[in-house]
Amino acid sequence: MSAQLLILSHVVLLQLIVAQLGPKIGKQFLKPKQCEITNQTVYDFHAQMLNGAQRSLTEYRNKVLLIVNVATYCAYTMQYRDFNPILGSNSNGTLNILGFPCNQFYLQEPAENHELLNGLKYVRPGHGWEPHKNMHIFGKLEVNGENDHPLYKFLKERCPPTVPVIGKRHQLIYDPIGTNDVIWNFEKFLVDKKGRPRYRFHPENWVQGTAVKPYIDELEREI
């Protein structure tokens, strides 16, 4: 195969991967789900950063957190473009976004940890994109299945799923399938200033962030 044909085949494959969305939903499922409040908080967990260091989530005490499982080659990837303006408009710096790359949905995050930031900067969303100082991108992890990260196990236990159907089996790169699973890239959990998960949002429940902003404002007003 010539070099040109090889490049073309890779481009076509990438386009097919990016085109894959999670399960389609009706408008009745776009309302966020409220989470069960318990004594356990996200501060009980730590996660690996891109450089391999472990970070305790206690560093985010008294912050409102938007926790997102992200992927570079997903139809929802352009939501990255909305994160910086939302954080930039948060004048008191209370809001932080924690991005957790995951490759479990149709292999849409194939990069290694050291490649992720360059992929975001030069490929998708590209155009020199870099994260706001209050957006923290962690190392790759698994959000579902046998090896789901303890943080995500906790979030799924506390917050009901946003839709009754998870998706097509061939698009889900993990086992076993659970009823509370994260359904696709860019699902979001909103955490209050005490570290308690409060709301869970479907990836399509976004609209440049306007669908989530009222709930962020609600938690920021709380003492």
Curated annotation (Swiss-Prot):
Annotated localization: Secreted
Keyword Hydrolase appears in the UniProt entry: no
Enzyme Commission identifier(s): 1.11.1.9
UniProt entry tagged with the keyword Oxidoreductase: yes
Enzyme class name: oxidoreductase
GO molecular function: glutathione peroxidase activity
Main location: secreted
Keywords noted in UniProt: Glycoprotein, Oxidoreductase, Peroxidase, Secreted, Signal
Active-site residues per Swiss-Prot or TrEMBL entry: C74
Example of a GO cellular component annotation carried by this entry: extracellular region
Residues carrying covalently attached carbohydrate according to the record: N39, N92
GO biological process: response to oxidative stress
Catalytic reaction annotation: 2 glutathione + H2O2 = glutathione disulfide + 2 H2O
One Pfam family matching this protein: GSHPx
N-terminal signal peptide: 1-19
Record family assignment: Belongs to the glutathione peroxidase family.
Xref: PANTHER family: GLUTATHIONE PEROXIDASE, GLUTATHIONE PEROXIDASE-RELATED
Description of how the protein assembles with itself and partners: Homotetramer.
Biological role: Could inhibit the oxidative burst of leukocytes and neutralize the secondary products of lipid peroxidation, thus providing the resistance of these parasites to immune effector mechanisms and their persistence in the mammalian host. It may also be involved in the formation of cross-linking residues such as dityrosine, trityrosine and isotrityrosine identified in cuticular collagen. Highly cross-linked external cortex may also serve to protect the parasite from immune attack.
Protein name as annotated: Cuticular glutathione peroxidase
Native species: Wuchereria bancrofti
Taxonomic lineage from the root: Eukaryota, Metazoa, Ecdysozoa, Nematoda, Chromadorea
